[in-house]
Amino acid sequence: MSLPQPTPRMAELRKPTSSLTPPEDPDSQPPSSKRLCLEEPGGVFKAGWRLPLVPRLSEAEKVWELSPRPFKGLLVSTNAIFDNSTDSCVEKSVSGKQICNLKCSNLKFQMSSCLQSPPSQSPDSDLRASGRSEAGLHDREAFSVHRSNSSKAGVSQLLPSTSIHDIHGIRNENRKQQFVQGRDNVHKENPFLDVTFYKETKSPFHEIKNRCKANSVVPSNKRENNISSSVLKISKSQNQPSLEIAKPSYFRDSGTISVPQFPMDLNSKMSSVYLKEIAKKKNDKKEAYVRDFTNIYWSQNRPDVKKQKLQNDKKTVEAENIFSKCYENDYPSLSSQNTCKRKDLISSNYCNCSSIQCNVRDSRKNFAILENANWEEAECLDSYVLTRLEKSQNWDCNVRHILRRNRGNCWIINNCKTKCENMKKTEEKWNWLLLLEIDLLSKEDYHCAKVINAYEEQSKLLVREILGSQTALITTVWLNGKGENDNTLQLRYNTTQKVFHVNNPFESFIIEIFYFHKSISGNKKDNSILTCCNILKCKKQIGIIGIQNLITRNMNTNIKNGILSIYLQDSVSEPLDILLKTNIAFLLNNFDSLTRIENDFELEEECIFKCMLYLKYPKNIVENHTAYLVKILTSSRLLEDNMKPMLKKRKLFRTEQVFEKSKKKLINSFSMTTQNTGFPIFETYEKIPLLMDFDDMDEISLIREITCQNMSCPQQVVNVENWAHYNSSTVKAHGNSCPQFIQNNRGYINENFYEVNMHSQDLNMERKQGHNKISNFDCEHIFEDLCNVRQQAIPASHNIIHNEETHTTSITQVLNFWNLLSEIEEKKYDLILKEEVKVTAESLTNSCQVHKDTKIEKEEKDSFFPMDDMFSVQSVSLISKEVNVEENKYVNQNYVTNTNEYESILPEREIANSKDFHRKNDSALYINHQFETGLSEGNDECFQDLAAKYLSTEALTIVKDFEMKRKFDLVLEELRMFHEISRENELLSTVETNNGQENYFGENDAEKVKMEIEKDLKMVVVNKIRASSSFHDTIAGPNMGKSHQSLFKWKTVPNNGEQEVPNESCYPSRSEEELLYSTSEKDCETPLPKRPAFLPDECKEEFNYLLRGGSHFPHGISRVRPLKTCSRPIRIGLSRKARIKQLHPYLKQMCYGNLKENF
């Protein structure tokens, strides 16, 4: 690419600095459309119109002594740079280059600028307009200068050889920096690359106030100069990386700069840094597409970088090496930069002036964004940038996190990606406590600290830090409250929803927002809440202590009038919401340490503490529902005297129905309420469901109900039922939330999972039946195979069959409960309670014994239960594995005894009214009798008759499945026998090898081998007989017919070491080969039946039975007989080349059956 020739216009601009023209000079003209060129290599530009020159690599540039490098921009105020006329001087180095040293006494930093011009380089050769002619560049508004009638400006130009430290500042007589004058007469700062430029405003320029500090450069006050900074919106394509480019003054306010793509080949001619602008009008808005900075990806391996070194200038060479390493290391991070999409953002690019260790263009590391909610009311901001030290991996601790008040506007610190890499390496924790304390102390009206949106990889570390400082944070919130804010203090953690996962340490969070309210009583001095809340720590921690500490231990309240109210608002994501809801009941069962009673206080029935549990479910509840959980204070010694009259006058417990639809629908129910008791029980005043539905759950509820009548009746049986029902998905997903909720992989309900959905007893039924009551309740119990059994009525006998684990836990809970009562009640009540506990324990143990005796190995079973005083058969989707007739008889006997007991318990008038009861009962007994006889005889017609007459469609399918399984078992047994015969043939195959060894061994050895083989065969036969007999004793047994019992009778045949062939019992006529088999009676221990072995009619019956799925061998399976013509053993049934007649008898049967079906 050839360089253009210099023009006289550019030569006029390039004069020494001493001849600079002030901006007030009317002779200073803006640059024309002509090309600008360089006058001489060592010259300095005239301070006219300053246009940004971007270095560009070409082959002509390789002769430069100083290689081009990316610029580092600084936000420097004009007063900071040009404060003193004596601070700036122009020196000339040994090599003839002019160096401009800038000194600022107030800021204590020095900046050196080395200027070099190439031999013949046009200053705007890099500024090209695509699709347009270069002659008309001044007519384009994208790069044209808007002039006004009142002021004019000059240009100062930068050469591409500018060093990293080089800052081009030019002083004039009025100590003002030369700016590009906008159309609104607003001066602009030096337009370096990647520097933040001031946005154009319509107010005149008065003065720029210097606010440079130790580690930050601050823009001036808006009230003084009405200057605000902005960052360009860079449209980032999906497949192309982009960079944030500062918005120069010669772009419009609404203009945006987008970076489409950049050449990745660093050595190509397209790798130079230049700007390509395209002006497009869209709704009076212009977009300038700027070519990306590709030269920043420097590599030391480039030949032009190695050759180009500046003589006698060590600083420039050092800066070159450092930046080459910096950009080479940060190459992948530059391609993944985010773009700013808002106009009202303040971007501060800060560079440490004392070193070159900070990468300005890496926006993820080096600058943060402060967002202001109301831009018009914004005050002057102290901008800050997180700096990174090159050698140490730790972030600078002196970085100031500033939280500014802006007339009620809440500032948001958005550091999504800062401090992420180094925190990951060094595992340092952010001091969240200090950050939140600054925010709380800086605000008086609204105490809300929005925690920085954390990076996803650092969520664990952040949560651990927050959990560690939780107590201190709550104390800080409480101490910072003033006056009217005591009732509205809150500490809010706002974190992204991406961080909330159940597996993360956020599982320890149960409640996100805590509201601390003073007591409602008039005397607030006695009601101080000091140590209120700790987060529920349910994972791998003591849950009881954490829940007890959650409720306040406020001891200095006035018990008679004070009411403690704690609002717990849940506004977290779904996983934490689920954890909270699953632990509600566990939280409610541990309210023993809620309060304590002072020594000289008499308990009254009205003096109670109300704990208001305020739950907010954004998805499920439209309105905020509250549930008042009432608990009367308990103290074993202080309440003993006061509770005696209460126990005598009224019942021990009185249950109430909370939900009207709980009998019909058992979901969303918290049906346990108690009232007027002296024990730790709860009451709900409003009919509001505490536990709501979820998308993935049907039921999440945990209720304990204890029903008992008046304690004056010593014969009353205390009925305490603890039934377990829990959703399997809930157990798997949220089982670890609490120690009481133990997770099991199968979803099996362990002994600690409880749900009771029970209804209150009917008093009228209790009066009619007396002590022999029938408790109506619906129970859904989950077995190991998740079989649902609904029991809608149970007789008076308490032998309820359910899991042994439930029995043991219920016994322990009964004992614990009555031990609690024994501390408060009198001795006579203690004796009554002990007797009742014994009765319940005996009934439970009896039910456990019944459960042990009736172990039926089924996944699902037929249940016969009473329903509305009538017995009916309801089948519950069963496929049984093994059913014994003896067990069925035992169950039927228990069933008959239960019906007899039920008839004896019910009044005679009820039995007389139910006329259909005996009919249904007789029909049920008849069904049972027919079922037993059908099983014993093995008659299929019995099942068909039962199915046609009495059974329903569901029961009919069950009977068919049962019959199919019975036939399938027979087929499996036949296969087992077939494999045993094949194993015997393998043993016989050893005879062939032994016959081959007779040449080497004597006849005695051959005889010994034959004797051993015969012994092995006999042992196999004996084992088969034992196995078949044991099999028929256990499985076939009485539930198989006599025809089935006669099957599979083995007939042992002593052999002489030769291969045996099975008896031919499947073809209707003999063939010529069948005459070759030996049929002597000596070879058989048991003779064949007297009737002929081969009858066509019998074969037809056998084949018909086989087609139905059975295996009917009336003559049994005899031992294989040897062939007369065979001189050596034959592997029958195992060779691939074997014929059909050489196969196993079982295979012959199957082949013949298939042929018959085909015909």
Swiss-Prot record:
GO cellular component, one term: protein-containing complex
Region (Interaction with RAD51): 1111-1159
Pfam annotation, one family: RAD51_interact
Domain of life: Eukaryota
Family matches, as InterPro entries: RAD51-associated (IPR053355), RAD51_interact (IPR031419)
Region of interest called Disordered, as start-end residue ranges on this chain: 1-35
Tissue-by-tissue expression: Specifically expressed in meiotic tissues. Highly expressed in testis.
Oligomeric form and interacting partners: Interacts with RAD51.
Name of the protein described by the UniProt record: RAD51-associated protein 2
Organism, scientific name: Homo sapiens (Human)
Lineage: Eukaryota, Metazoa, Chordata, Craniata, Vertebrata
